[in-house]
Amino acid sequence: MKTYLQVIISAVFFISANQIGCDSLSDLTKSGELVVSTVNNPHTHYSDHSGSKGFEYDLAKRFAHVLDLELRVIPAKNSTEALQLLDNGEADIAALGEKISSAPNFFQLETQPHTIANLAVVYMAGNSRPRKVSDLETLRISADIQSWSTDLIKSFVGIDFISSIPNASTKVLLDSIQTRAADVAIVNGIEFRLLQKLYPQLKLAFVIEETQIPIGWYVNNTSSGIVLKKLADHFIDTASKNGVTDSLRSKSFVSLSDFSNGDAFTFDKRIQERLPLYKDSINQVAEEFDLEWELLAAISYQESHWNPWATSPTGVRGMMMLTQRTAAELGVLERTDLYQSLRGGAEYFLDLHRRLPDDIFEPHRTSLALAAYNVGMGHLEDARVLTEKMGGDPHNWMDVSNYLPYLQIKKYYEPTKHGYARGAEAVTYVKNIQNYYQTLIWHKLVSKDSTQTSPDFQVALLPNSITGKHWSAL
């Protein structure tokens, strides 16, 4: 069923479409699907246990819904390949999340922008922070030669030479700083904001306010492509005016918003130093139980920080910090045995996951099962009953998480079946695992770019003509 906002968008959209003569969509709708080529990254499109996500994916899905089409996404290795899929007629739209300097060409059209981005200058924490363009004069700078960034840097900043990597992702450019191959990188500010938690040692120096980069979609310069562009233009305009694009964009930034830099730094260090010792074991057990290894890794990190010999003051032990009672029920003889602990924890989590009512769906089902792993199924059910009494949805994790802490307040826990529980700790527990899981998923996405090599960086030359440029130091 469409929401009120979707009905309004659809109505305005089709009125506008008729006004521009787009009442016949036979060429676009005969297949019953809208095919979008894109690249996998946290901003555009990626998948986890609850399905596909990403701003570009969410926006394209809304567009397909308005057209009454099914959305089919074709992930490409990079932007060049995504545009090639468009050129070959294998895709209707290329949604890249960036502006390519070589596009659109004669064969491609660009829709009106759904996003205005800025370039961000990024540096390594501990180094001297550049605050204005003249501070870059003697620094080694990396950028993507085929992106809009190089053209704009030369246009707005006046850099005569810049070290660049063809088809370089934001991840590759950020890696060039971490490996000390470059002093600063000039990247898409939106993507850096999303990836910053994966790079806790990198900081934003300043943004280049002059670089108002319009980012839209690409379509083919054909009769059907021209129609699709007009439809997309009206959709984007309507969605922007009704706040849909802002809402979807905000959704993209929620995932790691409460992940502190300190936690991110520690977790990144553990990923580099400790996870490699146990990743194969986690992978093996995850495959045995048909779990995502990232989810099992996130749970085990929250439980023990990937320490198979961990022991708490309350007596829980091992990689998955099983109680003696739970271990006995699961047939775990030695809780500090890595495989026994991982298998026991995976089995326990999946049992909780299965015991939830059938009409609870993802992503709420996994979040509720995680809460039960921490606080117990009985206390979780008490919280769900309380949530419903208070007017919330007991099937929705966000609603239940609001009322779990009430189990620490006497007037609320006394009438419950299982009594007092540390509900606030359970909420934090789930939130932490969500952060760790999301970080591991994003690490997997961006690590696919690691095969790209960095060039030999040289000093970028900044002419005196840059004096007077306006920069924003944050």
How would you describe each model-predicted region?
Residues L96-F106, S155, Q178-T211, E381-D382, ...:
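A ligand-binding cleft/hinge motif common to bilobed small-molecule-binding domains
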Residues G54-V66, A125-S149, I213-L256, P276, ...:
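Extended ligand-binding regions for polar small-molecule ligands
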Residues T38-P42, Q112-G126, Q196-H234, F259-D263, ...:
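Periplasmic-binding protein-like
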Residues L291-N307, L342-A346, A369-V375, I433:
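Short, functionally critical alpha-helical segments immediately adjacent to catalytic or ligand/cofactor-binding
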Residues G21-E98, S102-N105, S163-N167:
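Extracytoplasmic small-molecule ligand-binding "clamshell" domains
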Residues V219, L368-T439:
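Catalytic and substrate-binding regions of cell-wall glycan-acting enzymes that process beta-1,4-linked
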Residues R140, I145, W309-L333, Y339-D351, ...:
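Substrate-binding/active-site groove segments that recognize
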Residues L256-W306, Y339, L356-D359, L445, ...:
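Export/targeting segments at the very N-terminus of extracytoplasmic proteins
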